[in-house]
């Protein structure tokens, strides 16, 4: 089997959430045949995994996907030269299956009928939900001032989700919640759950012991240019820091991730958070912390940062939004509250019972190992592809 995978960024080496999912999918697909991954941004991967080749759309080199104001809130409206190059690669490689990453690249699905290849739309999020969340996070004045524009953006995003899902032979979602959100937008065909992966399975060997959880050592990891994560850092600084300080105990919070915006730098300086930009090796950071605060209020999909923290043995302390779609049990697998200050108070209380914290960390690790390992993802992808029709029906 020959498999063509279109991605926004080069997934090798995987760093951010989207790259981590794309890389895991590529590895699973490579167990079934030759994989060519084609990206719109970044440079060609110097050493992709076995049975995977990588190249970029040369016409897009240096442009940046969202470098200019887009006429659409979620779709990258590809210039003619980019679309023509993608078409030529598709024709030359002659794949049996094409996997397209998310709505931004959904215009590529329009090429499928003339090539008669089976197609998969891999939805990392339900983008119309993310757009709605972003608008809901605006101030009341901003919502009123721009209500016509915001209404148009919501409608465009919903329509893009519906059309892309209808064009693809199969849609992959990372949670049952996202599958339900997509189905609520209109009729969809074959929707399959392909779970998000543990980014680095070596963290499963990090020790879990009571001593690790006595100290108030917290670590938040995420792409620091992504607005839901920026908001989470705000919640950590404004809501959690005062409660931790009021406990009278020493505490530390590390914020680490790619491409932090200036607002993140300012928040870390103001609230005494340690900022580590573009960390080279996450397991070291994770191994030094006992707790992972994840007070997310916006976004979709399932949080790779939750899986990563649990696999590494941290006690995850999260909002309902942060663990949405994962099937975790509050009080058993993680600490739960939708208020950042209350999350901090729960961490302080649990740190007084370090053995109970270790047991919660072990429960979280077991859950993600059983449901989000590379073996589990490969099994799900193999089954999904095996049950696709052999040829496009459209």
Map each language-model feature to its residues.
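N-terminal subdomain of nucleotide-sugar transferases
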Residues: 1-55
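Conserved catalytic-core segment of nucleotide-activated headgroup transferases in glycan assembly
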Residues: 21, 193-288
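Acceptor-binding helix/loop patch of EC 2.4 sugar-transfer enzymes
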Residues: 61-72, 119-159, 223
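A charged, aromatic-enriched C-terminal amphipathic alpha-helix characteristic of glycosyltransferases
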Residues: 76-77, 355-385
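Donor nucleotide-sugar binding/catalytic pocket of nucleotide-sugar-dependent glycosyltransferases
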Residues: 150-205
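Acidic donor-binding loop of glycosyltransferase active sites
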Residues: 169, 287-301, 312-315
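Short hydrophobic beta-strand element within catalytic cores of glycosyltransferases
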Residues: 305-308, 315-319
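Conserved acidic donor-binding segment of nucleotide-sugar-dependent glycosyltransferases
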Residues: 334-341, 349-354
